[in-house]
Swiss-Prot record:
Subunit details: Homodimer.
Organism ancestry: Eukaryota, Metazoa, Chordata, Craniata, Vertebrata
Tissue expr: Expressed in lung, kidney, heart, aorta, placenta, muscle, pituitary gland, adrenals, mammary gland, bladder, lymph node, bone marrow, trachea, digestive tract, liver and tumor-associated endothelium.
Glycosylation sites noted in the Swiss-Prot or TrEMBL record: N83, N89, N113, N151
Transmembrane segments: 28-48
Record topological domains on the Cytoplasmic side: 1-27
One Pfam family from the record: PV-1
Disease link: Diarrhea 10, protein-losing enteropathy type: An autosomal recessive, congenital diarrheal disorder characterized by intractable secretory diarrhea with massive protein loss due to leaky fenestrated capillaries, severe hypoalbuminemia, hypogammaglobulinemia, hypertriglyceridemia, and electrolyte abnormalities. Disease severity is variable and death in infancy may occur in severe cases. Some patients show facial dysmorphic features, and cardiac and renal abnormalities.
Name of the protein described by the UniProt record: Plasmalemma vesicle-associated protein
Keyword entries, A-Z: Cell membrane, Coiled coil, Cytoplasm, Disease variant, Glycoprotein, Membrane, Signal-anchor, Transmembrane, Transmembrane helix
Membrane topology (UniProt): Single-pass type II membrane protein
Extent of Basic and acidic residues compositional bias: 319-328
Subcellular location, principal: membrane
Amino acid sequence: MGLAMEHGGSYARAGGSSRGCWYYLRYFFLFVSLIQFLIILGLVLFMVYGNVHVSTESNLQATERRAEGLYSQLLGLTASQSNLTKELNFTTRAKDAIMQMWLNARRDLDRINASFRQCQGDRVIYTNNQRYMAAIILSEKQCRDQFKDMNKSCDALLFMLNQKVKTLEVEIAKEKTICTKDKESVLLNKRVAEEQLVECVKTRELQHQERQLAKEQLQKVQALCLPLDKDKFEMDLRNLWRDSIIPRSLDNLGYNLYHPLGSELASIRRACDHMPSLMSSKVEELARSLRADIERVARENSDLQRQKLEAQQGLRASQEAKQKVEKEAQAREAKLQAECSRQTQLALEEKAVLRKERDNLAKELEEKKREAEQLRMELAIRNSALDTCIKTKSQPMMPVSRPMGPVPNPQPIDPASLEEFKRKILESQRPPAGIPVAPSSG
């Protein structure tokens, strides 16, 4: 006779309070007492309401039968009690084993819950890190795009600067050509002016010599013409004529009509008498022509003096123009050289600045790539840890599942926290001293 175990009974609950053998014996004796009470009650009722004399034998037989039944029930209950005792001992041992298993499972559950909580915290950290990594990847992408754009703009600016340099070189070559031509023309003008100056100097010397000669001749003429007096000259001529041999010879000649010169003597004498006046008129004409020549020479001298002054003024003007042109050419050449030097210096400075910016951007991109590589390594480690945690949680022997709260919504990324995260990652991934760091392939 076995002990029936119902759903929800005392044996169906695992982890209930410990119940000893007396607990079940108490119920057994209760049932036995109840049966005895019922028997006694039946006997009392039979004795009160039944026919004792008639039914004594039958009642006795029935009582014997009931006693036998009760005895058999007692034997069955005794056997059942022994079976129950055995089962109780077995159940106690099973209970102890189950309790031990429950304690082990509880410890495993606590350990798994702690691991799950740690995994949940790691999952939250991993989620936050994913946000940071997404922000870093986006910033790296933006930096790469900006670097490409800046490379394009730098190339375009460099090409434009090269074009400007070429244009400036062409303009400088043109200006140098123009300056060379201007310089050659100025040198040619200078040479022509010098030749003209030499010619002017020669002409001036010749004119000076001619002037000196004219002055000397004028002085001689003036020295000769100043003491000349017409009346005195005529008187002197007459006296000279009277004192000369010609009148005396004419007076000594006779008037022979038959002489070949007789008829001519009167005319000759008259001609000789008029000779002083004729000589005076000739001398006067000569003096007038001499005065005219002197006036003409004076006018020519004044004209030459004026031409000399004009030539000197022209020479001074040409020298001033030459100096002015030379100064302008030198100033323009200096200005062009200064402008060319300034443009070249500006182009070199802009080129150096652009090269420096490109190097800085390349270094920054290299740092971003290194950080991204480190974050990828950290992400791989976190992923492997999370997979291990999930596999551990998904294993059996999890009697109690404690639901965790929902993952908090991600907050907007703070730049300061992002920089702090980068610093922590770099510090965590920084190798110890003496160990070389392998260069990243990115």
